[in-house]
Swiss-Prot record:
Belongs to the PsbT family. Coiled coil: none annotated. It comes from Synechococcus elongatus (strain ATCC 33912 / PCC 7942 / FACHB-805) (Anacystis nidulans R2). The lineage of its organism: Bacteria, Bacillati, Cyanobacteriota, Cyanophyceae, Synechococcales. PSII is composed of 1 copy each of membrane proteins PsbA, PsbB, PsbC, PsbD, PsbE, PsbF, PsbH, PsbI, PsbJ, PsbK, PsbL, PsbM, PsbT, PsbX, PsbY, PsbZ, Psb30/Ycf12, peripheral proteins PsbO, CyanoQ (PsbQ), PsbU, PsbV and a large number of cofactors. It forms dimeric complexes. This is Photosystem II reaction center protein T. It is found in: Cellular thylakoid membrane.
Length: 31
């Protein structure tokens, strides 16, 4: 079960970094 916790934390960290970059720079995704 601990592996699921590490994967969840890793995914959350990637999500935070992705949204930080997406909102910091002009949106270029989907254009």
């Amino acid at each position: 079960m601990e592996s699921l916790v590490y994967i969840f934390v890793f995914v959350v960290a990637l999500g935070v970094l992705f949204f930080a970059i997406a909102f910091r720079e002009p949106p270029r995704i989907g254009k």
